[in-house]
A protein has these predicted regions:
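Basic/polar N-terminal segments that are highly enriched at the extreme N-terminus
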Residues: 1-13
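Conserved N-terminal helical subregion
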Residues: 16, 90-157
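Glycine-rich FAD pyrophosphate-binding loop
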Residues: 36-55
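Short phosphate-binding/catalytic loops that engage adenosine nucleotides
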Residues: 40, 72, 133
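N-terminal FAD cofactor-binding segment of flavoenzymes
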Residues: 52-93
Length: 157
């Protein structure tokens, strides 16, 4: 794949990569980390600069094994508030229902965290970089054109 950036850009991505990941949120950064760890040449492109504002994030216990596999459990714990369940409240607040993760989920995964999304995303993004992904911030991808040679990416920085 050959990323071709806008001529007015001040920074260019690697001229060739195995995988281009567009979007430096949780999914994109996680995928970039895993692929870079496998030795793939990865370029991770994010239209903003981290840390950046996003709504959320309420993590679930099923996320914990992934954080462990990435080697990020302690970093996520450091930026998060422990959460052992969820409470559902009716619109008029007449009914409440609390569910403990250990009772409703896998009892080996009794908790997760509530995190500030900007911090969470930055931890994952910087981890992808530490795993070997080339990261490009402030880069808006406008077009990806595929041909027999691979793909050309047009972006603005």
């Amino acid at each position: 794949m050959t990323p071709a950036l806008d001529p007015s850009s001040t920074e260019a991505a690697s001229p060739c990569c195995d995988v281009l990941v567009i979007g430096g949120g949780p999914a994109g950064s996680t995928m970039a980390s895993l692929l870079a760890r496998q030795g793939r040449r990865v370029v991770l492109v994010e239209k903003c600069r981290h840390p950046r504002f996003h709504i959320g994030e309420s993590l679930l216990p099923a996320n914990v094994p992934l954080f462990e596999a990435l080697g990020l459990r302690e970093q996520i714990a450091a930026i998060g508030m422990p959460k052992y369940g969820v409470e559902f409240v009716s619109p008029q607040h007449a009914q409440h229902s609390f569910v403990e993760f250990s009772q409703a989920w896998d009892d080996r995964l009794p908790m997760a965290w509530q995190v500030r999304r900007s911090d969470f995303d930055e931890v994952l993004f910087r981890h992808a970089q530490a795993q070997g992904a080339q990261v490009v911030e402030d880069c808006l991808v406008r077009c990806v054109a595929f041909d027999a040679e691979g793909a050309t990416v047009h972006a603005e920085m």
